[in-house]
């Protein structure tokens, strides 16, 4: 093996390591934030519970096909499912790779007009235009989220998945669907 072959192998190995590191950064970076919210895809049971929760939350509305935002939308599966159920759905996610993947899936599944995905911090997102919000949060995040969620208008809905909101005056618990990690709490804004 000549000197040039060794340099080529070393260059390829270095470029591969750099590419893997660059691809991993959006998935590792959440661990470095004040509140760690790792990407964990929603399970089939969680998606079914979200669907049941949406039915309960919107059953009193004459127009079930309102606007919905998923705060921390990950790979977009909740946004896509909600769009299939007739909601004009938006996903907000910090991980640029997951945002790109969500946009790709949306187009591939023919839901590009019913969905929108943004790379944005949930705490810097205007929630006022939305009738329903979905959050798969971490327990440590839920208390910090209550003041942000107060931007939503009265009589709007919140689906908190995996962890409930702490007791507060702004949101009234209406239903709990499922148990444990698959649980969904349905709240109505006072």
Curated annotation (Swiss-Prot):
GO cellular component, one term: mitochondrion
Key word NAD present: no
GO molecular function: protein-lysine N-methyltransferase activity
Top-tier EC class: transferase
Keywords, in A-Z order: Methyltransferase, Mitochondrion, S-adenosyl-L-methionine, Transferase
Broad class of the protein's primary localization: mitochondrion
EC number: 2.1.1.-
InterPro entries according to UniProt: FAM173A/B (IPR026170), SAM-dependent_MTases_sf (IPR029063)
SUPFAM superfamilies the UniProt entry points to: S-adenosyl-L-methionine-dependent methyltransferases
GO BP term, example: positive regulation of proton-transporting ATP synthase activity, rotational mechanism
Catalytic activity: L-lysyl-[protein] + 3 S-adenosyl-L-methionine = N(6),N(6),N(6)-trimethyl-L-lysyl-[protein] + 3 S-adenosyl-L-homocysteine + 3 H(+)
Domain of life: Eukaryota
UniProt-annotated location(s): Mitochondrion
Family of the protein in this entry: Belongs to the ANT/ATPSC lysine N-methyltransferase family.
Function comment: Mitochondrial protein-lysine N-methyltransferase that trimethylates ATP synthase subunit C. Trimethylation is required for proper incorporation of the C subunit into the ATP synthase complex and mitochondrial respiration.
Protein name, per record: ATP synthase subunit C lysine N-methyltransferase
Species in which this protein is naturally found: Caenorhabditis elegans
